[in-house]
Amino acid sequence: IAVPAFGPSLLFGLGEGAVLPIIPLMARDLGASVPMAALVVALISIGSLLNNIPASLITMRWGERGAIVAAGLWSGLGLALCVLTSHLALFATGCLMVGMSQAVYNLARQIYMTEAVPIAYRARALSTLGGVMRIGMFIGPFLGAAAIHAFGLQAAFGVGIAGVLGAAAIGARVPDLETPPTPPGQTPPAATTIVSTLRDHRHVFLTLGLGVVLVSAVRASRQVVIPLWADHLALAPAVASLVYGLAGGIDMLVFYPAGKVMDHKGRRWVAVPSMLIMGMAMLWMPFTSGFNTLLLASLSIGFGNGIGSGMIMTLGADHSPRHGRAHFLGVWRLMSDIGSSCGPVLLSFLAGSLSLAAGIAATGLIAFAAAGALAYWIPKTHGSERS
């Protein structure tokens, strides 16, 4: 069961992790300036952001298995375009395609696990799903580095293509979920649309959904905060990388216990502490003055983020209706991606206009606001599966 359920996520994360550190270097080799190379990298996030709603339509049309296979093939095609072209515009197009495939894959996997796993095990399943993908993203750069050492810079894309195509191959063997028949005497529910989903579930989107936006902003900012503050402290790049890697290691160790707590105690018991821990660590970071204190703050951020693995997916699954689930989760993931895009932008703005310390502290305050929103809006029951 574990291989078809989590194998595609491990391979998909591994494939993307292998190429992400190389994309800006390849863009520079193709003549991009430093700002242009950063924009090319950002196209992956932009592609995911823009494709969340179309991803829901693709999943409803082709089913979860078809969407997983299509996402792997589309990502492989995008990576192949990146490695075969000598034109920056086509390279950027390939990166956009990778981001688009992310949206389809992540949505299809979330829907599949939501419907296939009993609600009593939902948080553990979705936390493991998120954790396994993080493990793949962690392993990918090492495999990419080994390939580069042996065969050159472009070899990392070979690892990436193998990973996403392997995910598609395993995904093709995942059994389709059967749609429950309409009980005798009942009229089949009317077809849902994005507009009807926004209308019918606007209260959830405008309350808990805004909390999810804040959570995503904090999570995305953490990836920038640690290396920037390490540079501010004049630590060597290798030391900064070590701190970042250790924080990522803590992140990966705690996802399953956190999911078990969510299943047994309720979502609040993990969601709120996750944001409080990250908020306190963010507020502490500007007061760190060297390797030891920076490492402790970074490990705290990693722990807080790790216990929240799968939290956004679980909350979305809890509130999604059985009928029209793809539309609901497409909007849910769109809100999450909006937060992920805005968090680093706000940090950059505050760092430029005030100081880096002010930007990091503001991110910590956003984490506290997210904790308050989650504490207030998450239902007290363990789940809220809706018919």
Report residues per predicted region.
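Helix-loop boundary and gating motifs at the non-cytosolic
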Residues: 1-42, 207, 219-229, 233
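Core transmembrane helices of Major Facilitator Superfamily
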Residues: 16, 97-109, 300-312
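Helix-to-loop junctions at the C-terminal end of transmembrane segments
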Residues: 51-63, 254-266
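Helix-breaking motifs and short loop linkers at transmembrane-helix boundaries and internal kinks
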Residues: 63, 84-89, 266, 288-289
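Structural signature of the two symmetry-related core transmembrane helices
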Residues: 67-80, 161, 269-283
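Cytoplasmic helix-loop-helix junction between adjacent transmembrane helices
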Residues: 96-133
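C-terminal membrane-cytosol helix-exit motif in multi-pass small-molecule transporters
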Residues: 162-183, 370-378
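Juxtamembrane intracellular "pre-TM" segments in multi-pass secondary transporters
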Residues: 176-208
